[in-house]
Every structure is written in C-alpha cells, then in structure tokens.
C-alpha cells in the first residue's frame, strides 16, 4: 500500500529515466573541467543513445543558461537518432509566448511520435530576477494555456499575465491524445505545490530523507484531492552502484577528491535556480549529514558540494540500490530520474547491474496518451483544410 493514492496505482512498473548533461554538468572528478565531457551535441546525444541502449524509458534534458545545448533544439535533434526512449524536455515558462510554445511542443511530439514529456520549470531568466509569486503565476497560466491548446478546438484564456480570445488550436495539436504530453513538475513553495496539484501529472522531488519525502507527497496529495485529482510521484537522484558497498563508497570519495570548496560554490551559484527554496533544502541535507556526508545509510550528499539542484546520490552495492529503489516504490514513487558522474560511464554501470532486474514502464503509455496509429490531428492523419 502506497502512502498516498497515485494515478498509476494499478501498475507495479516504474519509469526509470537517465539524464543528459546539457548544461556543463559532466565530470570525472567534480569541479575539475574535462574538455572531453563538455556539453557538446556529440557528447550529449551519445548519452541519450547510450541510455536508450541500456533500456532507460525516458531521459531528462535540462535547461539553464550555461555553455551547452538549448533544450528544445537538442530534443528535436534527438528525434531521428532514437526510436524507443522518451525525452523529458525542461521548459522554463515565459521564455516563449504560450500558444507558440504549445505549437513547438506539439511539433516535437509529432517528430517523436508520442515520445515527448515536459518538465515545467519556473526559475529566473539570465540577468533577470523576478518575484517567486509572479514566476509561479506565469507558470500556472502557461500550463493552463498548453492544456487548452492540446485538448480544445479554440483557446480562450483570461489571466493576470496572458489573455487570448478565440484562437484556433489546430496548429498546436500534439501526437499524444487524452491530454497531450505529460507534465512533470518540481517545486517547494505553496504556489508551486498548488500549481502541480491542480494541473500537472508527476510531482518531482529532489533527494531528502524518506520521512521528509513522505511528508511532501502527503502535502501535495491533499491539495490534489481538493481538485478530485491524483498524481504520480518522481524522485530525481544521482546514483553510484558497484559490486560492493565499499567500492561504491570509495568511488564517491574519489569523485570529490579534487574538489575545491570555492570552485564548488561557484558552480552552484551560476545555476538559474541557485537561490530557490529547493536548493536551500539540498544545502540543509549537507548540514545534517554525518561525517562522511550521509543522511541515510545509502544517501550521500557529497554531490551537492559542486552542484545546484539535485544534490545527493544513492550509493551502494547492486542489492542495496535495488532495495532502496523498492522502498521508494512502496512509498508511491513511480518515476526515477537518475544520473551519475561521468554520465555515460555511470549510465552503463547502472544499466548493466540494475535495469534488467526492474519492471519498467513509459508513463505516457501507462496513461493511455500514445495512440497505436497516427492520430487524427491536423499534422498527422487528419485532412488538410
């Protein structure tokens, strides 16, 4: 029995995703730049193809103003070089006019034939700082407009920021049906939780103790119930898996062995979400960790010394990592977004040791969003007018 009701209650499978380091976030030793691991198209697309080969069902393509890849351009480039893996595109609300964003995402969904998922984010733009309440109001309105564009014939919207009247939705019809691409969302403020509970599909969390994660899940679930909704829940976490726990712990220590604290701080500060509430919670993890950086027997916070955002890793043997994932699943977590350093090597480590022992799924398929044949949309099987 899960601790909260989840949308995919009937399935025992879990969506296991990897991470493509689009934002200058790949290292053999944290904080030590390696030009062979820069966020080039060649390197990042190889991570995607490797994840597909290893059986991962989705891959997060993040967004930030770093030397690297633009998210939506990168996802478009991945369409012809992949065939099975879903792509989870991080979209910072407000960067694009909402109706045009709906059309852009619909185009990508057609290119991927239903393999697009969307991570809604609300962080600041480069060189521009705005009030949190405004940013989440903007995201709330963008999400509502996306859902109108993907499910209705006409877009009519009157919000505090955006107003549209009688705009045809034909150009924005996606490949996926019954609601369009799934919306994944992470955030910790009351405005963020309210937005996710009312409009999104998967609530994403960064690593904390299981007790705190359970509290967060319950808080969001209560809000969703007020709208007669359920959600699925996801965990974004790094992972280090080896044959033995000792090997995994030794690798974790080696990963940060050349890290200068000043360099780590500068890496954290350059992220667009560096001052967010979620990042503050990750910093708190490091404050309460034991002398080796662990807040639970297999949850290590050392990664957060040189990374904004998700700042902890599961560390252990194959059996220990499997046990940790199973315990999260029993809580009600149905999506894992994993990563490790360097991303290509750790993708293969996890894939070869763990993936074959997991029952995995694609959440868009579980939700019935992906049609068996080309849908009757203006851009697919529908008649041209």
What spans do the regions from the language model cover?
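Hydrophobic faces of well-ordered beta-strands that scaffold small-molecule active sites
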Residues: 14-20, 59-61, 86-91, 116-120, ...
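Short, acidic/polar
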Residues: 36-51, 71, 101-104, 185-195, ...
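Conserved, mostly hydrophobic/aromatic
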Residues: 51, 55, 78, 108, ...
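Alpha-helix-loop-beta-strand connector modules within alpha/beta enzyme cores
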Residues: 69-89, 148-149, 225-227, 233, ...
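Glycine-rich, proline-tolerant flexible connector loops at the mouths of alpha/beta enzymes
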Residues: 58-77, 207-211, 338-351
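N-terminal beta1-alpha1-beta2 module of alpha/beta enzyme domains
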Residues: 1-82, 176-181
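Active-site mouth loops of central-metabolism enzymes
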Residues: 22, 26-42, 90-99, 174-188, ...
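An alpha-helical appendage that flanks or caps ligand/catalytic pockets
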Residues: 2-25, 132-176, 208-330, 359-385
